[in-house]
Amino acid sequence: MKNWFAALLLAVPMSAAVASGGGHYEKVDIDLRDQVSLQHGAQIFTNYCLSCHSASGMRFNRLKDIGLTDEEIKKNLMFTTDNVGDVMHSAMNPKDAAKWFGAAPPDLTLIARSKGADYL
């Protein structure tokens, strides 16, 4: 009984604090001329996000738009395919993802288009 009471005392104030957060996102300042930063972001995305999420609205060869060569893309950013013209699919099987997480992680190109860069 004491444990339930202690849990209740902790849960109520914490839920109120979380609920009052308001879901405010800070404005992201993206400089599309900073190619080094964009290349670093592409590396972060392919190394971490693309493990679970797909980006089926984006092809690897579009990374040439930020100054990368085909060789750099193949060597540093491609892990699931050998064709630079392929779309960015998740390394994870969607059925496994749904089993592990309850739902497959969303495609991030759709999220970026619908909710904007500030959301990501």
Task: List each model region and its residues.
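Electrostatic cytochrome c docking/interface patches
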Residues: 19-43, 54-65, 72-74
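Bacterial N-terminal signal peptides
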Residues: 7-16
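Solvent-exposed, acidic/flexible segments
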Residues: 31-38, 42, 98-101, 113-117
